[in-house]
């Protein structure tokens, strides 16, 4: 009856996805970028040619002229074992992408799946979507598309080095990571590792789209350092009205570090987005700069946030076996700026057991024109324990009738506050919503061990909208 929980986390993103653009190169041509989406799950599509990431598409109207396309690479073997050999052939530039052309030779008797590729350009982690099955006993050419505009966000004007790692998976389910291979680019400006000056590299048309709110060096009071991994600098930027956080890590350990960034708070308010649990692999003895998309300014207004004063997030460090080594937190703050989140004019619909909740109203403010209307819910947890807030079957009634909603489950720690949205499944309505005079919504609130604390029901009513009252 309920939809997948992941859809709830994307509700806010889907609501205002007006920044999406068509895939570049969709008009065809030998050098055009393929228009199909990358394969995410094992299927027959694993045999299709892989495609570039869409991460740069939202910025494609801005110029990449400040980026030098002079850098090239020589042919080199990146990995060679008794199963597969992977070689780099050349580096070319197509549209707004730097394209690394490679050849893979599957020397085994089984098909091999290559995926989860890590690419560092000038020590900066560049997202590349790639998943492809290479047939047994055959050699095949393939390409990796690296968005130039994503590199420019890091302050890269020219490629000087490429470090690349592949994940190889066999039909038996066994998988392994290759050693990190290094490619030096010819005709490139020398660059000191870790010498990042984000603001100095942006020029031309893209400067109009990027505003640097803060370039902040972390100190011991709010930085993160554990097991040889340290967060050494950060920047909060806006690109095309969308906020991003840039984080620079240094891994001084002898082993790779698996880093998970999550539980993001803006202006001390817990928010959720599609990168609520973003995972990155930081290699030994390397710097790495990563980019985490947050929200558009318009989306933040739905959270009553007009200006960002600070961003806080958790960092979890694990080993290669997913065993947790340590947890910590860090923040990006803008000195002198005060966040403007304020729900003081609202009243609590429920305030017991240390949990204060309100379903943001009034009813007439709900957007009935939206395909799946959203009901904002504000929660403050003063219970002294971590709680989960979940939906259940028939937890939502509108005008006295049960209505399906996108299922949700939220985690909220003690002394934190959160605003999320319940997405109404309009397809489950018997008739189109033209007026709402009553909303009744219930929640299951449990502790971190799964024990039920309470099951509050909250009602919003507007009798003036009822056809009985109107008559």
Give each language-model segment a name.
Residues 65-94, 207-239, 339-368:
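Low-complexity, acidic Ser/Thr/Pro/Gly-rich terminal tails and inter-domain linkers that flank the onset
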Residues 124-190, 270-325, 401-448:
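Short, solvent-exposed, Trp/other aromatic-anchored flexible loops in extracytoplasmic proteins
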């Amino acid at each position: 009856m309920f939809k997948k929980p992941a859809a709830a986390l994307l509700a806010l993103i889907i609501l205002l996805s007006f920044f999406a653009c068509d895939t570049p190169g969709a008009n065809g041509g030998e050098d055009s970028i393929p228009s199909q989406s990358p394969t995410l799950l094992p299927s027959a599509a694993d045999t299709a040619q892989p495609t570039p990431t869409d991460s740069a598409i939202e910025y494609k109207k801005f110029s990449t002229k400040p980026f030098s396309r002079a850098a090239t690479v020589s042919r080199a073997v990146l990995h060679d074992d008794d199963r597969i050999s992977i070689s780099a052939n050349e580096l070319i530039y197509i549209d707004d992408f730097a394209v690394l052309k490679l050849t893979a030779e599957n020397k085994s008797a089984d098909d091999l799946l290559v995926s989860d590729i890590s690419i560092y350009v000038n020590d900066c982690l560049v997202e590349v979507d790639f998943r492809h099955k290479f047939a047994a006993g055959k050699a095949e050419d393939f390409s990796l598309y690296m968005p130039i505009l994503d590199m420019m966000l890091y302050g890269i004007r020219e490629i000087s080095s490429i470090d690349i790692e592949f994940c190889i998976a066999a039909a038996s389910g066994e998988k392994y990571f290759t050693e990190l291979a290094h490619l030096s680019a010819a005709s490139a400006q020398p660059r000191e590792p870790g010498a990042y000056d984000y603001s100095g590299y942006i020029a031309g048309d893209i400067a109009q789209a990027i505003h640097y709110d803060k370039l902040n060096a972390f100190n011991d009071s709010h930085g993160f350092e554990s097991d040889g991994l340290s967060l050494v600098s950060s920047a909060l930027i806006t690109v095309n009205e969308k906020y991003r956080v840039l984080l620079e890590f240094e891994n001084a350990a002898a082993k790779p570090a698996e880093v998970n960034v999550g539980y993001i708070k803006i202006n001390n308010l817990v928010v959720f987005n599609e990168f609520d649990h973003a995972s990155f692999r930081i290699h030994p003895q390397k710097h790495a700069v990563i980019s985490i998309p947050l929200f558009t300014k318009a989306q933040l207004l739905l959270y009553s946030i007009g200006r960002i004063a600070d961003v806080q997030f958790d960092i979890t460090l694990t080993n290669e076996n997913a065993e947790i080594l340590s947890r910590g937190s860090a923040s990006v703050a803008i000195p002198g700026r005060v966040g403007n989140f304020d729900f003081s004019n609202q009243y609590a619909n429920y305030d017991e057991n240390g949990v204060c909740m309100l379903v943001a109203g009034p009813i007439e403010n709900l957007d009935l024109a939206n395909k799946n209307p959203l009901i904002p819910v504000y929660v403050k947890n003063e219970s002294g324990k971590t709680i989960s807030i979940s939906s259940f079957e028939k937890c939502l009634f509108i005008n006295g009738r049960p209505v399906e909603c996108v299922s949700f489950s939220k985690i909220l720690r003690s002394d934190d506050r959160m605003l999320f949205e319940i997405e109404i499944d309009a397809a489950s309505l018997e008739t189109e919503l033209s007026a709402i005079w009553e909303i009744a919504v219930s929640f299951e609130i449990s502790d971190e061990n799964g024990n039920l604390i309470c099951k509050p029901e909250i009602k919003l009513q507007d009798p003036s909208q009822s056809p009985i009252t109107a008559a």
